[in-house]
Structures are given as C-alpha cells and as structure tokens.
A protein has these predicted regions:
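Proteins enriched for Cys/Gly/acidic motifs involved in redox and nucleic-acid/cofactor modification
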Residues: 1-85, 127, 142, 164-175, ...
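Short flexible coil/turn linkers enriched for glycine and charged/polar residues
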Residues: 22-26, 36-38, 138, 148, ...
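Conserved, mostly hydrophobic/aromatic
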Residues: 40, 60, 77, 116, ...
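Conserved SAM/AdoMet-binding glycine-rich loop
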Residues: 69-198, 206
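Flexible glycine/acidic-rich beta-alpha junction loops that bind and position SAM and/or redox cofactors
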Residues: 79-89, 123-125, 146-157, 188-195, ...
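Radical SAM enzyme [4Fe-4S]-AdoMet core and its adjacent flexible, acidic
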Residues: 86-110, 157-160, 220-255
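Extended hydrophobic-aromatic, low-complexity segments
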Residues: 140-142, 154-155, 178-181, 196-199, ...
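Terminal RNA-binding accessory module
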Residues: 229-354
Length: 354
C-alpha cells in the first residue's frame, strides 16, 4: 500500500523489484508511479488504473540500483504522469528530487542514461527543467505528450494549458537545455476539431520542429466526456477525415525528422551511441552492422542509429561515433576511434554473455 499525503493509503501498488524483464539487459523501464489524476476528456486511465500512486523515492532508487547492477545502462522512467511524481505522497522534492536520486545511482556506478517519459506539460516547472539541464546522467531528452495546439481543442480535451503557455514552456526548455530532443504525441479527429483547429496544429508542428512526434486518430471511449461529445453528429469527425489529418501531420513530421538527422550527418556530428543489437544479415564483407540509439532516441518508440563498424561490438556498449550518413529517420554512424570506446558498466560484456 502506498501512503497518501494525509497518511492514508490511496491504493495498492505492486512492487516491480522482482519482475521478469522483457527488455534487453542493457536497458529497462522503471515505473515511478501508477494511475493519474489529470482526467483528460478522452482518457479512461483514471477509471481503469485509479488515482495516481507514487512509489517512494527510496523504492525507486533501490530498484534503479538493482537494475543497473544487473547490467542496465539506460533507465526509462515511466508512469501515466511522471511530472506529478511525489505529490500524492507528500514528497516535496517532487520530480527534481526523483531525477537527482536516480542521477546519484548512475554516477555511483560510473554513469548511465536516465530518460524521462510521459511528462505532463501543464505542471512542468522551471525546477524540473533545471534538473534535466544540470544532472549529468539525465539524458537531454523529454517525452511530453501535448495532444493539440488549438486553444479550443485543448479546452475540449481538458488539458489545463493554453497554446501560448505551451509555446512558453517549450521556449524555456529549448533555452535552458542545449541539444534537447523533444518527443511528443498528438490526437487528431477528436470530437469538435475543425479544419481551423487542425491547421493551427500543423502550423505549430512546423514552428516547433520536434525531433520526434507521433499522431493518433481519436478513438471513441464510452463513459468519457469526449465519448459523449462523439455521440453528437455535429461534433463527430468522420473517420476518413481523421485519417486524412493523421496522414498530413505525419508527412509533415516525417520531413522535419528527416531534416534533423540529415543535418547531423552533414556536419559529421560526434555523439555517443548505445549499441542495441547486431544486424549481420545486412552487413557488407569486412563490416559489422548494429542498431543502436543516441540521446535523442528512446527505445521502441523512436528511430535507430545504424552503426557501421570494422570490429565487433556488444549490446550495452557505449561507443563514441561520428555521423556519416542518414537513412530516412535513422542516423548512420561509424565508431570514432578505439580510444573513444567505453563499456556501459564494469564487466558489462561478460554479463551479456550469460
């Protein structure tokens, strides 16, 4: 049971300490909380998962240490609303304190990547921005679903933020965190979305040039405010129109994403890449190919970095590389030199052979 700020339990929360991991050994998801208090109009999570329940900082730190001791170099922090971590249990350190605790865990083990996912924009503070900017093991990456950019849609969706406030937040993030990679998601075809609303969203995406963005067509959910709106023919967006809007937005974002990686290749950007897996079937004679990820790429949702190497590499190895080409969403790199190599953790290679 997780205790609330008033000392009363707010729900049962299974510990993840001994769970069976489905991810590769060198990276893992680390759940900081369960449930959500935001109650967006389109979402059923509060009714299914319940109110937000944060793990204690001690529990999150202990699990992080266990995962890193088992070979994980990258920890991806998840929860339905990571921004609000600690609020329900009265931990005034909040998300900055959580990130600082996880950074200490990584630094004590020689380094690592702490990546923040599922942040909620309306409560994202300057202290949270500063934590990402200054903590050495916290990756300069932020996954923050924005859902829309039209004020009327943000109101209908009950997102508790305006378009201008969103722009101000993104400007502060970009200013304080050089090289920040921003991932977001949007919903199109939500009941009440007009062509004007959609055009405002397209203009917002053109303006902000997100490194990564996804788009989903609205999905009807009974029992939600959006679901009730969707029953009104005047508000309902036809499925074919929602599909058109999804395609248009993703084509725009595709162009932006291609340009981001092409620019890195053109300037021969030097960057650290975490090796994920070999792709020997595609390798040329005398060359080894691997998929990996740089700071701007979260596992399973973002693009990959293709590593072309004359030597064998190991999953979990952190390699200093130079960008040499791009292939649509993916960056193509070569290892910088032998002295630029480092393994993710002591004995990491031996552990991965088990």
């Amino acid at each position: 049971t997780v205790n609330g700020a008033d000392g009363k339990g707010v729900g049962y929360f299974e510990s993840d300490a001994n769970r069976f991991r489905l991810t590769p050994r060198h990276w893992a998801y680390l759940r900081a909380s369960e449930g959500c208090n935001q109650r967006c109009a389109f979402c059923t999570i509060p009714s299914i998962r319940g109110k937000m329940r944060s793990k204690s900082l001690d529990d999150v730190v202990a699990e992080a240490g266990a995962l890193m001791d088992d070979g994980a170099f990258e920890l991806n922090i998840i929860g339905q609303d990571t921004t609000s971590w600690g609020f329900d249990i009265g931990d005034e350190r909040g998300l900055p304190g959580l990130l600082a605790g996880l950074d200490r865990v990584a630094q004590e083990r020689g380094g690592g990547w702490i990546r923040l996912m599922y942040a909620y924009p309306s409560k994202f503070t300057d202290a949270m921005i500063d934590a990402i900017a200054t903590l050495p093991s916290v990756v300069k990456y932020l996954d923050m679903p924005l859902q829309h950019a039209s004020d009327s849609m943000l109101t209908l969706m009950r997102r508790h933020i305006t378009s201008d406030q969103t722009r101000d937040l993104l400007a502060r993030l970009r200013k304080k965190i050089p090289n920040l990679a921003l991932r977001t998601t949007f919903i199109v075809g939500h009941p009440g979305e007009t062509e004007k609303d959609f055009e405002q969203l397209l203009e917002f995406v053109r303006e902000q040039r997100f490194e990564m963005a996804g788009c989903f067509k609205y999905s009807h959910e009974d029992g939600t405010p959006s679901g009730t709106m969707n029953l009104d023919p005047k508000l309902r967006v036809p499925p074919e129109e929602a599909a058109r809007r999804e395609e248009a937005l993703m084509l725009l974002q595709q162009e932006i994403a291609f340009e981001h990686v092409a620019a890195m290749a053109k300037t021969n950007r030097r960057l650290e890449v975490l090796v994920d897996a070999p792709v020997e079937a595609r390798a040329k004679k005398g060359e080894h190919l691997y998929t990996g990820r740089a700071w701007f790429q979260a596992p399973q949702v973002d693009s990959s970095t293709i590593i072309r190497s004359k030597r064998e590499l190991s999953p979990g190895e952190l390699v200093m590389c130079e960008a040499v080409d791009s292939a649509e969403y993916d960056l193509v790199v070569k290892p910088d030199d032998e002295t630029g190599r480092s393994i993710s953790l002591p004995l990491a290679n031996a552990r991965h052979k088990h």
